[in-house]
Amino acid sequence: MADGIEIGFGPLEQSGQGPGGSGDLVVFVGDDLSLGSAAREALGASGADLVARAAASEKFKGRSLSALSLPAPAGVGADRLVVVGLGSEKDRAKTDWPALGGFTASKVAGRTARVVLDWPGTTVTAAQAGEFALGARLRTYAFDRYKTKKKPDADDKSVTALTLLLADHGAAAREGEGARSLSDGVILARDLVNEPPNVLFPAEFARRASELAKLGVEIEVLEPARMRELGMGALLAVAQGSAREPRIVIMRWNGGPAAEAPVALIGKGVVFDSGGVSIKPGGGMEDMKGDMGGAAAVVGALHALAARKARCNVVGAIGIVENMPDGGAYRPSDILTSMSGQTIEVINTDAEGRLVLADVITHVIRSTKPKAIVDLATLTGAIIVALGQDIAGMFSNDDTLASNIHAAGEATGEKVWRMPLIPAYDKAIDSKFADMKNTGGRHGGAATAASFIKRYVEDVPWAHLDIAGVAMSSNASEINRSWGAGWGVRLLDRLIRDHYEAR
């Protein structure tokens, strides 16, 4: 968790003050090593010369996301000076504020630090300071609750106290509260993805999602008997090989006008995916505890929205199952009847996530009549082959929604790339024996999977995010060192903030 970090805000005038001369003072420089006026004042007349001499000795060039640590000069109220590089003027013009916050937090881990957000040519805004704080919080996250033997330096993984100093510190403090709400949502999602499947089975996942009621979210949990009444033959088939019964959790945040249709966020929640009868190879199967990354993102997003009292109506829905093989498991060649009435020939029991989504989407459309649907799922290995582990695949039937999601991804760094949906992909899932089959062959696997889901969204604007490459075991970044990334929470929050909240 990121519980060890405390972030406050203060005026630039505090740059030269410190508790008993202890802790760190953090200043920023570009590739010309110039200090901002507040940093110069804090360091005194010889400060710039001190930094220049230390930089020359250590071959520090002020490159973006580089750092230099040295003993602080006398009288600055700190015992260590940390100089963080911002790069060239071009680099500074496109500063990634969460990344800068995460990098800075990593350089002052376990210490008290005053961070002077001031450098030549830039007046740091409250919003930018909030993004900086968000990155710092996310960087300090660690999932170590099951480790009984901590490393000797374990305490150095979190910041004791970080005070961000800038001109508009009052507004920045308000932005910091928003950053805390958002980071809490991301951290919740990371925790869920990182949990082992013997702990996070469907009923336990549903229990944790239900805790959002404390924030004012309305919770409804569907158990198997109710699913059978609704005719959810697709989802129930996936679950029938497991001793752990499935759950569907419906989470409603009613922050907008009562008559306004909600935005629906839908997540695949396969808490462990063995592949079922079409069992996966042993190598890497342990990663399949993360096959619920889409559901985790939806829960995290609802947490963030409710915590900041978002002015909109949002319904989150997650289908939680375990896909296991036993004598009662569903089989290749089975024909299932989904809640929509459409029939599905099972070709591969390891193509289970789309079956779960089909019934959850139908239920959400019928019960809430959403204005738009965004589903998130760790759906296919094919999307990793196509896009790697830095970007998610997006499929959509609506250009406006797709454009808005793309913009939210660019703004947050949770980037998406739109993939094609053409009739040929839809034709590939036609079945000789049922309305459709659950796989479309070897080629274009991500697209045929999306085409399957598309058959269930009716005429609602819809986007499908295949997050198999980014939700777990993705490339490390300045704001994430966790196996479970919590990917999607920030994107969904930004999408709703920019396009669905009342102004």
Curated annotation (Swiss-Prot):
InterPro entries: Leucine_aapep/pepB (IPR011356), Macro_dom-like (IPR043472), Peptidase_M17_C (IPR000819), Peptidase_M17_leu_NH2_pept (IPR023042), Peptidase_M17_N (IPR008283). It catalyses: Release of an N-terminal amino acid, Xaa-|-Yaa-, in which Xaa is preferably Leu, but may be other amino acids including Pro although not Arg or Lys, and Yaa may be Pro. Amino acid amides and methyl esters are also readily hydrolyzed, but rates on arylamides are exceedingly low; Release of an N-terminal amino acid, preferentially leucine, but not glutamic or aspartic acids. Its cofactor is Mn(2+). GO terms for molecular function: manganese ion binding; metalloaminopeptidase activity. Mn(2+) 1 binds at residues 273, 350, 352. The gene is pepA. Presumably involved in the processing and regular turnover of intracellular proteins. Catalyzes the removal of unsubstituted N-terminal amino acids from various peptides. GO terms for biological process: proteolysis. One of its GO terms (cellular component) is cytoplasm. It comes from the Bacteria. Pfam families: Peptidase_M17, Peptidase_M17_N. It is an enzyme of class 3 (hydrolase). PANTHER family: CYTOSOL AMINOPEPTIDASE, LEUCINE AMINOPEPTIDASE-RELATED. It is found in: Cytoplasm. Mn(2+) 2 binds at residues 268, 273, 291, 352. Its EC number is 3.4.11.1, 3.4.11.10. The active site is at residues 280, 354. Binds 2 manganese ions per subunit. Its main location: cytoplasm. The lineage of its organism: Bacteria, Pseudomonadati, Pseudomonadota, Alphaproteobacteria, Hyphomicrobiales. Belongs to the peptidase M17 family. Keywords: Aminopeptidase, Cytoplasm, Hydrolase, Manganese, Metal-binding, Protease. This is Probable cytosol aminopeptidase.
